[in-house]
């Protein structure tokens, strides 16, 4: 994924009301950015960090600038735009960069499924193969080199795991992909210290046939690419 036009840089002043962030550009201009992340953003929104933002061509948007990346004072890059996790995963599947998800010729997005009427991020299909249901989660919470999900209690995430267990029980392929969008993370675990129920459900899901995968994105202000498998400890 190439950023075109190129991202612009600024210095973070504060994030507030979850969806907004005040920044100062290198020439001293004050801007308010849209923050496309409803999570806690622990370690991703420290005042003084460098932020990289995109600008929409839609002139009707109240906040035309979108916060895409944080470059921390320690040199780590973090993608804070949660929409990018799905885009990067879709691109990686289509370009056959994820061997575990190769061999399908049809990719559908936002398909309704399950007893709780959820929407799956992606469904892959191919002749003579069971349908493959994929749920994608964005991982940005880091403690040293350890990456964790979620960064806050997520009942929605718990529901998705229950739905995937149902998919696996019905004979289909069920997969949860943790897209690691933090350059300092080298391994992944569920955040048992934040959402114990999610961690327990993830272990249960794996035991019932749900595949748990984690891939790390190469991040820069110029491009992003999901391709590197990350070790998982449940």
From Swiss-Prot:
Belongs to the SfsA family. The keyword Isomerase does not apply. HAMAP family: SfsA. The lineage of its organism: Bacteria, Pseudomonadati, Pseudomonadota, Gammaproteobacteria, Enterobacterales. Keywords: DNA-binding. CDD domains: SfsA-like_bacterial. This is Sugar fermentation stimulation protein A. Binds to DNA non-specifically. Could be a regulatory factor involved in maltose metabolism. The keyword Acyltransferase does not apply. It comes from Salmonella gallinarum (strain 287/91 / NCTC 13346). It holds the Pfam family SfsA. It comes from the Bacteria.
